Amino acid sequence: MRSPLRNMLLTALFAALTAVGAFLRIPLGYSSFTLQVFFTCMAGVLLGPYWGATSQAIYVLLGLVGLPIFTEGGGLMYFAKPTFGFLLGLIPMAFIIGMLMKHLRFKPFARIALSCVVGLVALYAVGLPCFYFALGGAWSIGKTIVSGCLIFLPYDALKILVASLLGSKLYGRL
């Protein structure tokens, strides 16, 4: 069991890593390929459900209060951006990954991979409806799914693979 101070430091570290991951990006229309999903997976895997979700909540809150840590800055204006739901989705994503890590009984690689896939589904379950409604229904649901999800899945699969490989080496060691 980790000390509360160690948990707080690791939580702050993963909030910072998620912020850094926002700037390691390839712009693509309304969104970008970033490393935020990777760091959210790692937060859930290594910190567990509560501290992992807290790290992502801190990241989102710091961006909303104006720190320029989102891909296009920060501030309350992000509520109106089509991609804001994906930022919110990082919180339940980390929580679900951490919870599954506690309860699944597979070998570490498989447990991490499955947990991250389910967490990614949660991210898209929050992000896609927000994306659709923020665009005012101007896009069809099909175009929203393609542009807000399907084009990112190969890259997300790669991030989950790397998180599973790295996480299986680090799990239980932090």
Feature roles, as predicted:
Residues L13, V20, M77-A125:
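Short helix-perturbing small/polar motifs within transmembrane alpha-helices
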Residues A22-F33, I58-M93:
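Interfacial aromatic-anchored transmembrane helix boundaries in multi-pass membrane proteins
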Residues M8-L13, F38-M42, G52-I58, T83-L88, ...:
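Hydrophobic alpha-helical transmembrane segments
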Residues R2, R6, L28, S32, ...:
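Juxtamembrane/transmembrane-helix boundary motifs in multi-pass membrane proteins
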Residues M1-A53:
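Hydrophobic transmembrane alpha-helices
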Residues L17, G21, R25, A43, ...:
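Alpha-helical membrane-inserting segments
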Residues P108-L174:
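Membrane-embedded alpha-helical hairpins and interfacial helices in multi-pass inner-membrane proteins
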